[in-house]
Amino acid sequence: MAESDGSNNENGNLDTVTQKLDRGVAAIKPQYLTTKEKFHVFIDADGKEVVDKQTCSELSGNDAENTVRAEDAAEPEAKRIKLDDGTGEGQDKPPTSAENKQEKKRARGQNKSRPHMKHSQFEENKLCPSVTQECASKCFFGDKCKFLHDVAKYVSEKPEDIRPNCYLYETFGKCIYGVTCRFAKSHLGDNFKNLINEELMKQWEGQVLVKNSLDKSLKEQLRKRKVVFEKTDKYLKLCNKSGDSLKIKSPVVKEDNAAQVVQKDSPVTTVGAVTDEDLVKLRPCEKKTIDFRNKLYLAPLTTCGNLPFRRLCKRFGADITCGEMAMCTNLLQGQPSEWALLKRHHSEDIFGVQLEGAFPDTMTKCAELLNRTIDVDFVDINVGCPIDLVYKKGGGCGLMNRTNKFEQIVKGMNSVLDVPLTVKIRTGVQEKINIAHKLIPNLRDWGVSLVTLHGRSREQRYTKLADWEYIAQCADIASPLPLFGNGDIISYEDANRALQTGVSGIMLARGALLKPWLFTEIKEQRHWDISSTERFDILKDFTNYGLEHWGSDCQGVEKTRRFMLEWLSFLCRYIPIGLLEHVPQKINERPPYYMGRDYMETLMASQNVTDWIKISEMLLGPVPPNFSFLPKHKANSYK
């Protein structure tokens, strides 16, 4: 009996271990599963079957002491052993809890202080803009110009063209990058003259494809602080006069002498119902309104939510798009890199910008500035950003604990905007203390047009699933104010369950990064078993959109490559429908090592940076000799 009990216990323990190992791992059909070594051998051999064990060990790099793959370097030692063979064999001494904590801390979060290539690293000799733009006049700097003026010399030293056809020339009839274009042979004539297709150019004449660019004169005014903020100044004066903007109320006046009564605090002298104000504040009913209900909202994704990616999502069925988070202080300083985040493609019919800030004066000024300088349909306040840099300054999630400042920001921005004001929040700051339900009624009273709730707290991040029960509770409290839910939606079934909670719509973030065709799946109510060829075509489209947006010269090509690599760090986590044992894929389950149905599908499943670069080289040519890339997100749970 004792022996029997012992063996049962042993079997039970083994089952428990197996269960623990399988937890959090996606279930893939057995015929596609493989080992880590075989997976990388297959990739390194360009899809050729390697039968010889000796060759296999050579290709896999048996002397791991000298060569360590990028993904292994980021993985804690204890976890690597556990994931590779599921046992702790080979460990002379089990790691202490302190060592485990240290390893986990090192592998989580983001890669901060990442190296970025400078513009000067893209090419040694840069051609002078006066030559590139074929200016009639000579270079303004003359002999002191640091750039190259000899076109023949530039062409002889320039890297080989990536491919024979230029997307910009074939689409618009002219490539503005001329001889510097990495596809220049298709539009260069005699003496390196840039060719123009007049008929094709006429088709685009008068069309504005990208809006919201920063004007040079406005940039100078912002840098010299010459921009006047009339509406903001009036709002702030009103705040200062009352001592507390939250207690400002209009006096109750009897109808018979209403025309004769003047508010004591009013800065404007009135005569009856007429004032001498040049700009009269719009009433809520006169503001532009948007019907947000039952729409698919692409989240404002930092780094990855760029204009080319939004164009792709728009094509797949996204209804609402929003620019990446922009810092209000940087916008007020006229920083071109920050203003670039506000650009809008003409295909984005419902488009907003997201602002981050911690103080009423800067946020209200920024809202007033954008209201009169750019074309947007709504402005969103980021009250969900969890990063320390923002939180410690009182912005992002920090505003959820600073309700007085939060109210002043919302009321101030609402007073200067002609478009709806929306807010994105989290469930709370601390993991088990939800406070969103307390804020939502206030947001409704302050004049917010839409609230988007991410079903996680700041401290929780992505360690647990989004709390959709709490989102449902908040949606009920918010009514009639529209509330969108956000979190863990990666299939149309997830979307249907989310909509059953009573939310007005859903926001897609990581799900859209893993599979941008998710919008199509939701609208057509189907699982799309997309092929690797179709996925590669999506990357081709992103490449073309990137070259159009960032440029087809060396700098533009490398910018496009960089953002493609950032996106590939998410795309590689997608598991094709045909390989799954249970459809759909769960967003919190990491993919095991598997062989795809063809080489490209297998290559796209690799979480090794080297393989992402290989994909980028198929579209953008070889990387420069000094190229380096470190992914922004370590994504430890998926390695």
Curated annotation (Swiss-Prot):
Zn finger limits (C3H1-type): 122-152, 160-190
A Pfam cross-reference name: Dus
Region (Disordered): 1-20, 52-122
Residues spanning the membrane: none
GO terms, molecular function: flavin adenine dinucleotide binding; mRNA dihydrouridine synthase activity; tRNA-dihydrouridine47 synthase activity; zinc ion binding
Biased composition (Basic and acidic residues): 66-85
Example GO biological process: mRNA processing
Catalytic residue positions: 385 (proton donor)
Keyword Metal-binding among UniProt keywords: yes
Keywords: Flavoprotein, FMN, Metal-binding, mRNA processing, NAD, NADP, Oxidoreductase, Repeat, tRNA processing, Zinc, Zinc-finger
SUPFAM superfamilies given in the database record: FMN-linked oxidoreductases (SSF51395)
Origin: domain of life: Eukaryota
Biased composition (Basic residues): 103-119
EC identifiers of the protein: 1.3.1.89, 1.3.1.-
Listed cofactors: FMN
Family according to the record: Belongs to the Dus family. Dus3 subfamily.
Record protein name field: tRNA-dihydrouridine(47) synthase [NAD(P)(+)]-like
Naturally occurring in which organism (per UniProt): Xenopus tropicalis (Western clawed frog)
Gene symbol of the encoding locus: dus3l
